[in-house]
């Protein structure tokens, strides 16, 4: 395997921090932003110290765990809620396995693992979010929302974010309109300009 080569494989499992594991011959490749069971195309972008990482290029086949359509208009470009197409119970099960593995790897004694307790509400539950101003794309219009998955600078408008109450969507829309109307620029990290 060499950097830049493209492969296809099935994500066998997802470890904490959304790190998918794809087996290619005798090599396990870490591919972020997938769901167990998805057949994906990825490009090798890091190879060092016996570890290989790939960048997801395309989902070729859905996973059996993907049993519903996404509710969000900017899914899957946004990295805010990766598992929207999975049933909530399946998300909890997968996350519980990830947490249990973290504990198993960290402690060398027996312990009692309490299962995850799911929220009674699946969407519009967040009372805190960190939205950013930025360009929708390079030199594009001002946007206010969440960073595009895998991007430090591109920001997707979160006009109908399903993680927050609809009142927050209205506030975001008003704030964005206010700054666009006045031509106020966001703070550009590289140029040290804007507000």
Protein language model features and the residues they cover:
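Accessory RNA-recognition modules of RNA-modification enzymes
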Residues: 1-195
């Amino acid at each position: 395997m060499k950097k830049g080569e493209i492969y296809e494989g099935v994500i066998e499992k997802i470890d904490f921090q959304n790190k998918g594991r794809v087996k290619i011959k005798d090599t396990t490749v870490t591919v972020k932003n997938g769901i167990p069971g998805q057949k994906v195309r990825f490009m090798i972008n890091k190879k060092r110290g016996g570890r290989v990482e790939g960048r997801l290029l395309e989902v070729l086949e859905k996973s059996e765990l993907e049993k519903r359509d996404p509710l969000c208009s900017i899914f899957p470009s946004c990295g805010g809620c990766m598992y929207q197409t999975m049933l909530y119970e399946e998300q909890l099960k997968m996350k519980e396995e990830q947490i249990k593995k973290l504990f198993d790897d960290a402690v060398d004694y027996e312990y009692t693992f309490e299962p995850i307790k799911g929220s009674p509400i699946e969407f519009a539950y967040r009372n805190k979010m960190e939205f950013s101003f930025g360009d929708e794309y390079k030199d594009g219009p001002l946007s206010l929302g969440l960073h595009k998955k895998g991007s430090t600078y591109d920001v997707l408008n979160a006009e109908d974010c399903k993680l927050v109450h609809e009142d927050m969507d209205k506030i975001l829309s008003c704030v964005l309109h206010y700054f666009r109307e006045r031509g106020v620029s966001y703070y550009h990290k590289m140029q040290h300009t804007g507000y």
